[in-house]
Swiss-Prot record:
Pfam families membership: DUF1641
Superkingdom of the organism of origin: Bacteria
Organism: Bacillus subtilis (strain 168)
Protein name according to UniProt: Uncharacterized protein YjlC
Induction text: Transcriptionally regulated by sigma-A factor. Down-regulated by rex. Highest expression during the exponential growth phase.
């Protein structure tokens, strides 16, 4: 039993000697000095990180907030989803009608189409789009 205690003491004293040897190295002393000088900043940083973690944890576990967020996102996206469905359905129907029609559109047919309010909206949009594209191209 005394041999075990002696071995433990020898091991501890060897560990202490290794630690002292490490601490006596100039680069270790310089690093420790820099670390001690920066302790106030490190403490402030740790406090900020702790507060951020606590906030993130409270947000992540707040079921009411999660529910409200999901509700708000759903409320915003639902009209967009419906509009996208309407646009897709209209485009599909128009494509089907155009494929089914053998009608030839002549010059007078085009002139009649130019009076259509929907066609006018489309032309105004296309004109504005081209103007914006031209302005952006000139800015480059």
């Amino acid at each position: 039993m005394p041999e075990t205690i002696d071995q433990t003491n020898a091991s501890v004293s060897q560990s202490q000697q290794d630690l002292i040897d490490q601490l006596l190295k100039p680069e270790v002393q310089e690093s420790l000095t820099v670390l001690v000088d920066q302790l106030p900043k490190l403490t402030e940083l740790v406090n900020i990180l702790t507060k951020s973690y606590d906030f993130a944890q409270s947000v992540a576990t707040d079921e009411v907030l999660k529910s409200d967020t999901v509700g708000a996102i759903t409320e915003i996206l639902e009209p967009v989803k419906e509009t996208a469905k309407e646009v897709a359905a209209t485009a599909i129907e128009a494509k089907d009608r155009a494929e089914a029609s053998n009608e030839t559109i002549g010059l007078f047919g085009l002139l009649r189409m130019l009076k259509d309010p929907q066609a006018q909206k489309l032309f105004r949009f296309a004109n504005s789009y081209l103007e914006v594209m031209n302005e952006r191209e000139n800015q480059k």
